[in-house]
Structure formats: structure tokens, C-alpha cells
Curated annotation (Swiss-Prot):
Protein name: Ribosome-recycling factor
Annotated region described as Disordered, given as residue ranges: 132-152
GO molecular function ontology, one term from the record: ribosomal large subunit binding
InterPro entries named in the record: Ribosome_recyc_fac, Ribosome_recyc_fac_dom, RRF_sf
Annotated TM spans: none
Species for this entry: Alkaliphilus metalliredigens (strain QYMF)
């Protein structure tokens, strides 16, 4: 039963890392990357739809994204959504496709983005700690219900801490990698 707790904890923490990775990918680092538009939603015939469902996004050059709508009538909606986003990009619409030139990041913007990345990483760590707390509570309940001995509880809690440390280390590695990517000129 205690292995079940550890297994659920690992699954929960793996999902947390996946979310963190997606969050990091949506933060632009100076290079054109189609995943930076993953969070953009477009008003498509009255319903809010993710950009990738109404258009294809490609990066033919390091500082250029091309957005080609599947339905040309939605191009103005896409342009409006891009202008309203927090990416700070100015779309160029030629009626068929939208070009997004990715400007070089200023030193000030780079520092701002590293703060954002650190905050996102801390949110990930908080989620990991919450998972650890939940697992430890389950283990204590199992001990209280006489499903675990005191020694087994201690051993299981140590295993929970090892799992948490392993995932925290991965968060730290992801953070360092993203910071280097942002600060790279």
C-alpha cells in the first residue's frame, strides 16, 4: 500500500514537471519558437479556440514566425489576439498569412523574463511540496489505521522526501537551462 502512495506521488510530480515545461516553453527567449503561441486563443465564430486549431505556425527563420490560418476569414481575429497577448509582438498581416518578427530582447526585458521564469519555477516547487505533504498525510493516516508500523512510516516518509528531492533537482535544472536560454545574446 505504501508503494501505491509513492507511485501516485511520482505520477503527480511528473505531471507537475510537464506543466512547468509547457509554461517555460511559452516564455519567449529571443528565438522564434512556435510553442510560444500555444496559449494564444482566438475568437473563432463566437467560440474561444486555441490558435493551433485555426492556423499552422512555423518558424522559417530564427527571428520570424509565420502564421497561416486554415480559414482566411479568421486572420483579423488572429491578429487581434496576438496584439492583445502579453508577448509584446507586432503582427504583420498581408491578408493570407501573418508574420511575427521576433525582436532582439533588451537587457531589461531579459531580466524581467528571468524573474518570470523564477516565479514559474517556484510555483512548480510549491506544487511538488503540496504533493509531498499529501503523500505524508496519507502515510500518517495509514499508520493511524494500523496499516503501517512506526518504522515503516518513517521509511516511507524518507522515500517520499527522496522522490521530492529528485523532482526538485529537475526543476532547478530546467530553471538554469531556461535562464541561460533567455540571457544568451
Amino acid at each position: 500500500m505504501q508503494l501505491e502512495v509513492h507511485k501516485r506521488l511520482e505520477e503527480k510530480m511528473t505531471k507537475t514537471l510537464g506543466v512547468l515545461k509547457d509554461d517555460f516553453n511559452s516564455i519567449r527567449a529571443g528565438k522564434a519558437n512556435p510553442s510560444m503561441l500555444d496559449r494564444i486563443t482566438v475568437d473563432y465564430y463566437g467560440s474561444i479556440t486555441p490558435l493551433k486549431q485555426v492556423a499552422s505556425v512555423s518558424a522559417p527563420e530564427p527571428r520570424l514566425l509565420i502564421i497561416q490560418p486554415y480559414d482566411p476569414s479568421v486572420i483579423n481575429g488572429i491578429e487581434k489576439a496576438l496584439m492583445m497577448s502579453d508577448l509584446g509582438l507586432n503582427p504583420s498581416n498581408d491578408g493570407k498569412i501573418i508574420r511575427l518578427n521576433i525582436p532582439q530582447l533588451t537587457e531589461e526585458r531579459r531580466k524581467e523574463l528571468t524573474k518570470v521564469v523564477k516565479r514559474v519555477a517556484e510555483e512548480g516547487r510549491v506544487a511538488l511540496r503540496n504533493g509531498r505533504r499529501d503523500a505524508n498525510e496519507q502515510l500518517k493516516k495509514m499508520e493511524k489505521d494500523s496499516e503501517l508500523t512506526e518504522d515503516d512510516l518513517k521509511q516511507a516518509q524518507e522515500e517520499v522526501q527522496k522522490i521530492t528531492d529528485k523532482f526538485n533537482k529537475q526543476v532547478d535544472e530546467m530553471l538554469v537551462k531556461k535562464e541561460l536560454e533567455i540571457l544568451e545574446v
